[in-house]
Amino acid sequence: MVTLAELLALLAALLATASGYFVSIDAHAEECFFERVTSGTKMGLIFEVAEGGFLDIDVEITGPDNKGIYKGDRESSGKYTFAAHMDGTYKFCFSNRMSTMTPKIVMFTIDIGEAPKGQDMETEAHQNKLEEMINELAVAMTAVKHEQEYMEVRERIHRAINDNTNSRVVLWSFFEALVLVAMTLGQIYYLKRFFEVRRVV
């Protein structure tokens, strides 16, 4: 029989397999992150550019044999999942080399699934239903946590866009008001000079 403490420890271990990070990538720079897994392990990368330039970044996932698994150019967000094709260290890289001067802030999460079970466990006919339910609950909780983090980032991005647009509209309105006042004063001056009576002495 599985105790409550063992169940909580299993749930905590399952939730700990997903790591969320914010990283700042300077112009002309590349940042890489590494995960060592066994063959057959399910892995996933979820990312979103939170700040900087046109909110785009180059993404590349490479296997231990230097085989390209995924490559995306100028992406602002994305989700990609795959199963490890061999044992070893997998490389997740974000490149800002296309940017001339703007650093980018990228929020990303690397999800590492459970390692594949051994033959002796696969041959068992009966699996513990409680462990299965806890595993499903942990996956669902991780997905909700990721979705909440991405919603916060999107809300921050849209608020920054709204503030920027609002300040531009206010500045443009102020400029238009100044032009209107200048034109009004110019017309008054012109009409006043037009109706002036010039005396010849």
Curated annotation (Swiss-Prot):
The keyword Chloroplast is assigned to this record: no
Lumenal compartment residues: 21-168
Signal peptide: 1-20
Location relative to the cell: Cytoplasmic vesicle membrane; Cytoplasmic vesicle, COPI-coated vesicle membrane; Golgi apparatus, cis-Golgi network membrane; Golgi apparatus, Golgi stack membrane
GO biological process, one term: somite rostral/caudal axis specification
GO MF annotation terms: frizzled binding; smoothened binding
InterPro entries cross-referenced by the UniProt entry: Emp24-like, GOLD_dom, GOLD_dom_sf
Motif COPI vesicle coat-binding, chain ranges: 194-201
Keywords: Coiled coil, Cytoplasmic vesicle, Endoplasmic reticulum, ER-Golgi transport, Golgi apparatus, Membrane, Protein transport, Signal, Transmembrane, Transmembrane helix, Transport
Motif COPII vesicle coat-binding per UniProt: ranges: 194-195
Region described as Required for TMED10 and TMED2 cis-Golgi network localization: 118-157
UniProt function note: Involved in vesicular protein trafficking. Mainly functions in the early secretory pathway but also in post-Golgi membranes. Thought to act as cargo receptor at the lumenal side for incorporation of secretory cargo molecules into transport vesicles and to be involved in vesicle coat formation at the cytoplasmic side.
Note: Animals do not show Tmed2 protein expression and also have reduced protein levels of Tmed7 and Tmed10. Prior to death at mid-gestation, embryos exhibit developmental delay, abnormal rostral-caudal elongation, randomized heart looping, and absence of the labyrinth layer of the placenta.
Assembly information from the UniProt record: Monomer and homodimer in the endoplasmic reticulum, endoplasmic reticulum-Golgi intermediate compartment and Golgi. Probably oligomerizes with other members of the EMP24/GP25L family such as TMED7, TMED9 and TMED10. Interacts (via GOLD domain) with TMED10 (via GOLD domain). Associates with the COPI vesicle coat (coatomer); TMED10:TMED2 heterotetramers are proposed to be involved in coatomer association. Interacts (via C-terminus) with COPG1; the interaction involves dimeric TMED2. Interacts with SEC23A; indicative for an association of TMED2 with the COPII vesicle coat.
Family the entry assigns: Belongs to the EMP24/GP25L family.
Protein's UniProt name: Transmembrane emp24 domain-containing protein 2
Organism of this sequence: Mus musculus
